[in-house]
Regions:
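Short beta-strands and strand-loop turn motifs
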Residues: 99-100, 175
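C-terminal non-catalytic interaction/localization modules
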Residues: 1-59, 67-78, 89-92, 106-132, ...
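Structured alpha-helical segments in the cores of large, soluble enzyme domains
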Residues: 83-88
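A short beta-strand-to-loop transition that corresponds to the Sensor-1 phosphate-sensing loop
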Residues: 63, 100-103, 135-138
Length: 316
């Protein structure tokens, strides 16, 4: 008797592109929660298993990447942490990432930003080596009746979508998650599994080892997510330091200024050191670090000027 073949899949993509519905179609049952808006639904990772022909299919539904996530520190870090969990939860690794997008919607630069975000999490070559592009809303394609097969339609695409097709080596499939026609359900699932099996036969999986190779880019991504908040907090502290520096310059007797300047220099140094720690040698906070260093230089210049003035007075 032939042993069953394991296939491990991770669903990824933009929020509300039908990832959970696709997962249910692959599993042939309602296992994943499917909503029109999943912004708060799929921040975690869930998985279910089913049998199909001689395959045991394990489907993981990853967190959705919404447009707001790309600009929001908290959401961005949540997604990264959830993706890390998806990798550690399945130590055997994944045969394929199913990158889910909708047929019928224009693939924009924002969508490309989502792909870029995912590449910074999983590695620059993960699309090329492990991704299958799945277009949901297959029923919409058929209703348009444009006289083209799906393959012909793909060949006509231009711009960022064409670039994505080329990057994933034209591993693309159309899915209708709404159909009740059993033959159609079986055909699209069979086509997908055949595509995944070709990846499986290479003997490769995306594992934690692949994930660790992308760690540097992922750390920089997380630091960049914090940059707006770190910048705001830093500029607030710098403003207070410079305000106190100006007050000291105008109101404190020359012979007493040094202790005030030393206190301010220590504050500036603490601020600089704290930002360096948060930067984690990624360079993401370079501009903020440079600004803070300039404040230290300004205070050091004031100390030098103060010392010169005191020395000149002592000569008199």
């Amino acid at each position: 008797m032939e042993l069953p073949i394991d296939i491990d899949l991770l669903l990824i993509g933009k929020t509300s592109n039908g990832r959970s519905a696709l997962g249910n179609t692959i599993l042939r049952r309602k296992a994943f929660l499917s909503k029109s808006s999943q912004e708060s639904v799929t921040k975690k990772v869930d998985y279910h298993v089913s049998n199909f022909n001689n395959f045991v299919i394990k489907v993981f539904d990853g967190p959705g990447v919404g447009y707001t996530c790309l600009d929001d520190e908290h959401s961005k870090i949540l997604v990264i942490k959830a993706m890390e969990f998806a990798i550690t939860t399945n130590p055997r690794g994944y045969h394929a990432f199913l990158l889910v997008t909708e047929y019928g919607g224009r693939f924009t630069d924002k969508d490309q930003d989502t792909v870029t975000f995912l590449k910074r999490i999983f590695g620059e070559n993960f699309v090329k080596n492990f991704c299958i592009l799945v277009l949901t809303n297959g029923d919409r394609f058929e209703s348009e009746d444009n006289g083209l097969t799906f393959g012909e339609w793909c060949k006509e695409q231009t711009g960022v979508f064409k670039e994505l097709l080329e990057e994933c080596c034209h591993r693309v499939i159309l899915f209708d998650n709404r159909t009740e026609v059993e033959a159609k359900k079986m055909k699209q699932l069979t086509d997908l599994i055949e595509m995944v099996d070709k990846l499986r036969l290479r003997g490769l999986r995306y594992t934690d080892e692949n994930f660790q190779k992308a760690r540097e880019a992922r750390e920089k991504l997380m630091v960049e997510a914090k940059e707006p908040r770190v910048c705001e907090e830093t500029m607030y502290e710098i403003s207070l330091i410079l305000q106190k520096l100006q007050w000291t310059h105008e109101n404190v007797d020359q012979k007493d200024k040094r202790s005030y300047f030393d206190d301010l220099q220590q504050r500036a140094k603490n601020l600089y050191d704290n930002i360096q720690v948060q930067d984690k040698e990624t360079g993401a906070l370079h501009d903020i670090i440079h600004t803070t260093k300039s404040v230290q230089v300004t205070i050091a210049d004031e100390i030098k000027i103060s010392q010169i003035v005191i020395q000149e007075r002592e000569k008199e």
